[in-house]
Amino acid sequence: MCSLFALVAVAALAQSRAERIIAEIRNPKSKYVVVIAHRSDWRHYPENSLAAMEGAIKMGVDMVEIDVQRTKDGVLVCCHDKTVDRTTTGTGKVSELTADYISTLKLKTKEGVTEYGMPTLAQALDLCRDRVLINIDKGMNYYNQIQKMLAERNMVEQVVIKSSKKPTTVAKYLDKHSQNMLYMPIINYTARKWEVHSPLFESYLASDIPSIAYEICWDGTLKGERKIFNRVIKSGAKLWVNTLWDSLCGGKEHSFADNHALNGNEDKIYGKLLKYGVTMIQSDRPQLLLDYLESKGRHTLP
């Protein structure tokens, strides 16, 4: 019996941290709550920088969210905006600049110019591989290029990609590959978008698309989000919520945004989300969320 336990322990050690997180995401019964750092550790380093990613990894998050744009010469770089104006010492649209030029720029924060440069997606993948999962935002239009980069690094399932595209459109991307990134539909439960997203939601639930999770955004203009949550959970997928700002998670009157969890209010915000069955949370205050989850025994990998 002891030798059996020893073998199990050795097997667990042989798995990378990323693989262990993936196993929890794939397990519908797991109560482990996956913490996603929005634009990585941007409170201490420039957003989407390698330093911010490293900071988030050391913090203990499960996934870093990064945004990608493609340069004039076809290189994917980690940048949220279509231009480099806000985040770097340069100017211009990413699509009209070369990767070499962008590599000469320095990233900026509200405090000023930093020592850090804008990384390529390749550099980000090499840093994160096996250590933390990645959520690539704004990436569906570059799906095949990203897939190739991941396959070369043997880390295809270490990336979550998402969109509000129709299942039939997504299927065209997935069908080209024998192994795909983890896919997540974005569903907006709002008065402004629900007319379109209601049939989108139904079509995903009825489709063969292997949706690992559903990102549900709601602003309080419609009632009944709990029914949407429950249907996601019943499907066997994970329920992903963004606690970044009010309009993504309940609206001003019933917001679950991170700032409302400050000053000892974690139970009222994060605790309620856990009761709703949320098991993936993208946060702008990942350390606050991690501390809370660990205090509740909801962030311990087997």
Which residues does each PLM region occupy?
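Bacterial Sec-dependent N-terminal signal peptides
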Residues: 1-18
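Phosphate-group recognition and catalysis centered on beta-loop-alpha active-site segments
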Residues: 14-302
